[in-house]
Structure formats: structure tokens, C-alpha cells
């Protein structure tokens, strides 16, 4: 089976942590977290091997909406 990954860049380490903890069907393959004042953007690679596009996009949309609507 061929490996496949998607890389997502985040505006803050808090956003990155929230997404990693709340996306249930994707596995974190690798990530890098930078301090907010460093000027770098944090990123996470998710393993999407064997996933159909909707298996990736729909959960990502849901968790990003949760992030935007948090209190």
C-alpha cells in the first residue's frame, strides 16, 4: 500500500493542538510546533493512506468549524 500524507499549517500552536486532539479518523504522522512569536507557522502531517478524499475533507471541515466557534 502506498503511503499518503496531507500537511496542514496552523496559525497558532493552540489551533494545531486542538485539531490534532479532535480529528478522530486521521493519524498524526509528524508535526512541528513553533512558539507564536517566532514568525514560523506550526504544521502537522496527517497519514491519509487508504482514505478517500471525503474521508479527509469532511472531518477537517468539522474540526475547523469547531475551532472557529469555540468560546
Region annotations inferred by a language model:
Residues 6-15:
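Short, surface-exposed ligand-recognition loops at beta-strand->loop->(often short) alpha-helix junctions
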Residues 1-5, 41-43:
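A general secondary-structure signal for short beta-strands and their flanking turns/coil
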Residues 1-3, 65-71:
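Short intrinsically disordered terminal tails
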Residues 16, 20-64:
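Acidic, low-complexity, intrinsically disordered interaction modules
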Amino acid at each position: 500500500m502506498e503511503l499518503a500524507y496531507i500537511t496542514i499549517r496552523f496559525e497558532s500552536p493552540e489551533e494545531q493542538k486542538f485539531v490534532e486532539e479532535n480529528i478522530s479518523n486521521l493519524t498524526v504522522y509528524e508535526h512541528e510546533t513553533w512558539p507564536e512569536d517566532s514568525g514560523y507557522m506550526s504544521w502537522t502531517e496527517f497519514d491519509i493512506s487508504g482514505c478517500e478524499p471525503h474521508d479527509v475533507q469532511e472531518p477537517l471541515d468539522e474540526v475547523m468549524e469547531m475551532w472557529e466557534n469555540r468560546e
